[in-house]
């Protein structure tokens, strides 16, 4: 009886240690990514702060233009952020939003759609369309403050991506 109990004890101990190691590895990888993003923010803080409003405006304009088609050119988000003149981008956004302000619910919704479009850009077209439909439904279920918070977080992460 003692041998099986001892064997069971060692099996459980081994499994426990293995689970702890796997948990530590997962935490380490996540912490490493977070540390890298923090380093990027600190190293490029000024650039990051300047890039955030550009990314936000680009996201809003991108989705607004898809829906309202004020500019006949189908711009890529990457081009809006990195190559389009910032004054022109702001003018295009104002034209697209019309009577809606940049702080409006409409603008925030466009911003979220633009941000998620970029996050899902790597997916095949059909899958991307399906996911964007889910995003639209999720946006409708969020409160105004939750949408603003989500948009801010998304734009911050996008800006980090452009710094990499």
Put a short name on every predicted segment.
Residues 1-4:
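Positively charged n-region of N-terminal signal peptides that target proteins for export
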Residues 7-15:
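Bacterial N-terminal signal peptides
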Residues 20-164:
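Mitochondrial intermembrane space
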């Amino acid at each position: 009886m003692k041998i099986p109990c001892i064997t069971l004890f060692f099996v459980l101990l081994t499994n426990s240690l293995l689970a702890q190691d796997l948990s530590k590895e997962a935490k380490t990888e996540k912490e490493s990514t977070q540390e890298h993003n923090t380093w990027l923010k600190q190293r490029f803080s000024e650039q990051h702060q300047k890039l955030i409003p550009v990314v936000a405006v680009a996201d809003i304009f991108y989705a607004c233009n898809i829906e309202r088609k004020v500019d006949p050119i189908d711009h890529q988000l990457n081009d809006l952020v990195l190559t389009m003149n910032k004054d022109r981008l702001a003018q295009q956004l104002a034209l697209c939003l019309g009577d809606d302000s940049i702080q409006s619910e409409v603008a925030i919704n466009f911003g979220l759609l633009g941000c998620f479009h970029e996050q899902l850009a790597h997916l095949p077209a059909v899958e991307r369309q399906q996911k964007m439909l889910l995003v639209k439904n999720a946006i409708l279920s969020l409160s105004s403050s939750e949408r603003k918070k989500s948009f801010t977080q998304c734009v911050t992460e996008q800006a980090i991506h452009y710094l990499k």
